[in-house]
């Protein structure tokens, strides 16, 4: 996929993408899934790059999107032991450490598709006392 330039098909060229619309991407995803459904799942269903592009900031875009376009893998870490796939019940806590300049995670995720990925997009709660989706 990487040697064919398929990673980051819909991402802007400035990040190493092809800047294609969603239609050719969907066609490619269908072809890949027809040959190997498991690989199609990892390549397209877990397409975290779209989520990162839509909701990430410029720093995150420049740090992570070129890496994915170059062939590094991503996973979307959502499922927890007591929440299953009910994302409203996610309890993993994210706390920003001024001292370390990064987010610290406290909790458990499980059943992560592509869990050995290079980059992880993790769903966590960062506001004390929240239970709703934000």
Positions of PLM-derived features:
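Internal helix-loop-helix
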Residues: 2-70, 113-115
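A short core secondary-structure module
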Residues: 102, 106-134
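Beta-sheet entry/capping signal
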Residues: 6-8, 37-41, 73-75, 102, ...
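Short secondary-structure boundary/capping segments
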Residues: 24-27, 57, 91-93, 120-122
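A generic local secondary-structure boundary/capping motif
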Residues: 40, 64-65, 91-93, 109-112, ...
């Amino acid at each position: 996929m990487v040697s064919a330039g398929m990673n980051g098909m819909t991402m802007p060229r400035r990040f190493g993408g092809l800047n294609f619309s969603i239609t050719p991407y969907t066609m490619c995803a269908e072809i890949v899934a027809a040959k190997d459904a498991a690989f199609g799942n990892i390549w397209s269903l877990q397409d975290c790059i779209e989520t990162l592009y839509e909701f990430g900031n410029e720093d995150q875009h420049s740090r992570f999107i070129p890496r994915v376009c170059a062939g590094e893998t991503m996973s979307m870490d959502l499922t927890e032991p007591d929440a299953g796939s009910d994302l409203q019940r996610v309890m993993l806590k994210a706390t920003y450490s001024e001292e370390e300049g990064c987010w610290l995670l406290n909790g458990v995720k499980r059943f992560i598709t592509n869990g050995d990925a290079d980059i992880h997009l993790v769903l966590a709660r960062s506001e004390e006392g929240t239970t709703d989706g934000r």
